[in-house]
Every structure is written in structure tokens, then in C-alpha cells.
UniProtKB/Swiss-Prot annotation:
Organism: Caenorhabditis elegans
Annotated region (Disordered), positions in chain: 355-407
Bias kind Basic and acidic residues: ranges: 355-373
Name of the protein this chain belongs to: Protein upregulated in glial subsets pugs-5
Amino acid sequence: MTHLLLLLFFSCVQLTTGQFYCADLIQQCAKSAAEYTEQILQYKESAFKSCVRRPACHTERKIFDECFDASVSATHISPPQESTSNDGETRKVTQPPMVKYNSLLKFFTEKSMNFRSALDQCFVRSPFVPKRNFFGPSILDEDAAYARAIYQFDLADRLWGLPELSVTRPSLDTLGVCRTQNTALRVFGSGISRIARASDPKKNNLTSSCMLDEDEITCYRQALDLNSEYIQLIYNRDYALRACIQNLRQQSVCRMNDKSRLRSCLCGVREQYDNDVQAGILQCVKSKSPHIPAMVIEMSSSLDEEPTSAKIQEQVTPAQLTFDTPGAIVNGQCMCACEHSAKNEATRLFANKKNNNDVEKSTQIEKKPEKQGPEIQEEVVEMETVKDEQPPKTSAVRFKENSPRLMQPSEAAGRVFWMNNITIT
């Protein structure tokens, strides 16, 4: 009966002091280090912009940051504050509306409520849980276990595979206390576009998606690890978090005697929340960008409109190919024995004569009927066929009139012969 009364007492304490008292106090510690956190994020953003070259990575990173900021805002909800008026009544202060992330909070509101509820349950003392021996296992840094429960931007670094520090060990090792491996598996920047449909190979491939290579990662690491101001900001932030956590641990309601069980509970709740937030961020990124920005596919297109097939496909007119043949056929006559210069000259003369005939025909069609008579009489030249004189009688083979004589190939160079219906008898 005594145990049930104790449980009822602690439940009433939570209802009167706040919905999730200890969980909300832990999240409020992030505000004590907000000044240092903001400067750290600026250094990370500057290193990312200067080292990463692909525009698709910058587009995906921008959308990711908006969704991740919404998850942080949904988790760091301030507890309702109370104020006392002049008449002695206690009234709740209305919180300012969160306009910036209202459209994105739907992905993380329910998850953050479950996280805060499970986190607050870690501090509930249950009489049904057996007590451990006094000399049982303990943790080296209890503050780090509390800091692990603070939801900050460390998850963003893990999703991109870009750890905060790689040279020195952090003063507040939140991952080490929970034995969490900082794997190099990237959810973003791995060559799979998170802002495109996975079934569309035209928009989700290695050329149009974000892929961080080794040179970019090395540049990013050197820009941060070799910056003394950046490292000092991390130590200042951890120091501010540790001071806030130590003040929190002085409250008996947010302190546990079984430190090992408390660490296990805090680490397990945070790991589950990271998995839920990761799924929510993937949904948020796709919903934030229903259409792929044009710069992901076309570097020269606009960001405000989706590229069409007419823009993507370039209309190419095939070039006319010229072939250098060893001969040419003119009026059915093979002039393959001509030299290269003679062939070119014969082809040119043939083309010019054909063009002149086409021009004359088009000119005659365009002229008016009443003016065609006198002009045609002046331009038309009648050609009379003059018969060749009779050759002297001989016993050689006789040819018909106007029959051509045999010519050497060198004599036929540059000449065009117009002969029809020629037979040899």
C-alpha cells in the first residue's frame, strides 16, 4: 500500500509541475549553450559550402537543414510558464507561435511527445524493479549520459557522415558513454537523391544526386579540425552543458541512485528517437521538395520551374557528310579516270548549271503574264544544230553524225559532255 501511495505522489508531482518535468528540463539545457551552438553551425556551414562542389548537395542540404531545424524546435518545447498578476491569480503565459516551421512540425510532433514521455519515465522510481548492489557497475561520466538525452545537431552530422571532431576526443563524450559507433554510413550525400523518387532513374542517379567524394570530405575535415576557434567553441559548449546538467542533477526527482540503469534507459530512449527522427526527416525532405529543382538535372536551367523534355533533350541537326570518291558519273558517263582536280571541277560545273536552271525557272514563274512576251523574246536564244562536214571516204569504221571522238583522260579534265542516244554502228 505504501508503494502505491508513493507512485501516486510522484504522478501528482509531474502533473502539477509540468507534463514531462525532468525530460523538459534536460532539453532546456540546450538553451544554455545556444550561443556556442549557433557559432559552431556557422563554421560547419561555411566548410560545407567551400568544400562541396556539386549543386545537388547544396540543394539537398538546404532542404535537410529546414527539416532538421523543425525537429529540434518540436523537441525543445518550453514548459508553460506561470505569472502572478496584481490580483494574486496565477495565469499561464501564452507562448509565441512558431510560424517558421508550422508546416514541418507535423512530421515530428508526435515523435517528440513519445520521446519526452519515455525520457521522463527513466526517472520514475518503481518499487517493482529490484535494487542493485551498492558495488554494482557504474559509469565514469554521468553528465555525459544526461547530455546524450539532449537532442541537438549531432544527429545531423551522423546522417551526413561528417563527425564534429575527428582528431581530438570531446570533453563531453555523449556517444562514447552509450557505446554508440560513429559509422561512416551516410543517409544523405551517398549518391542516392533524397529529394527525388527512387524509381525515377533520370532524376535519381550518380550524375544528378549528391555524392560526397574523399577530396571533399578531407577538405571539410581540415577546415574544422585545424581551426582552433572552432575547437574552442566546442569545449565552451560542452562546459555550458555540463554546468546545466549538474544543476539538474541536484534535484532529487531527476536523480537516480542506480546510475547504470539510468544510463541504459537514457541511451536506449535516445537511440529509438534518432531512428524515428531519421524516418521523419526522409518524409519531410520529400514533401518539402515535391518537384526536383531544375539545377539538379540541368545546370543552366532555372530553380523555379521543373525541366521539361524539350529542355532536357537537345535538338541536334546532323552535319552533312562529304565523301571523296575516286570518280563521278555525268549523264551516264563514268569519269573515273579523271584526276582529283578534274573531278572536283566537273562536279562544281554540274552543280552551278543546275542552280542556274532552277533560278531561271523560278524567275519565269514569278513574272507577270503581260510582260513575259517581250522579255522572253529578248532572253531566249535559238540554237541551230550545224551538221559536221562530210569526212573523206575511208575504210575506217563509220560513226553517226555528232558522235564524239575518243579523248585522253587529261583532255577531258574540266569538261562536261551532254550527249544522249549515242550509238556506234
